[in-house]
Amino acid sequence: THFMMGGDSVGFWADVLINAMGNITIDNVGVSDLILTKYFRNSFLATKVAFFNQVYDLCQATGADYETVAKHIGNDTRIGHSHTTITDERGFGGHCLPKDTSALIKTAQKHNTQLSILEEAINYNNTLRKDTN
């Protein structure tokens, strides 16, 4: 198991985790690195959800079986099966994915950096979520 930690109390919390869990790896990184890592992980997963919703749309349009197509895409270990389930609500929701994708976009804008792929995933997701409400 691998953990990232940052801040002034890393030593204390690393000891607590090692005592509780045994053989683990802990990286002591800067707080900015921790925050961006969380935002990017959740943004990647949100983008993956949006992508697989488009896979679903094309399967519906062509008569292909989404479950079969998604299964075989996910069998590629570089892709995996997480975040490929199509829900009745469609797209990504919940608390973390919308919040973190929005925060990452705002951070990028503040630093004059484009995240156009993520922006498109959010726009597509907003369209999906509107259509099902």
Residue ranges and their predicted role:
Residues 86-87, 100:
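Terminal amphipathic helices with adjacent charged low-complexity linkers/tails
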Residues 1-81, 107-114, 120, 124:
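Internal alpha-helical scaffold of NAD(P)-dependent oxidoreductase catalytic cores
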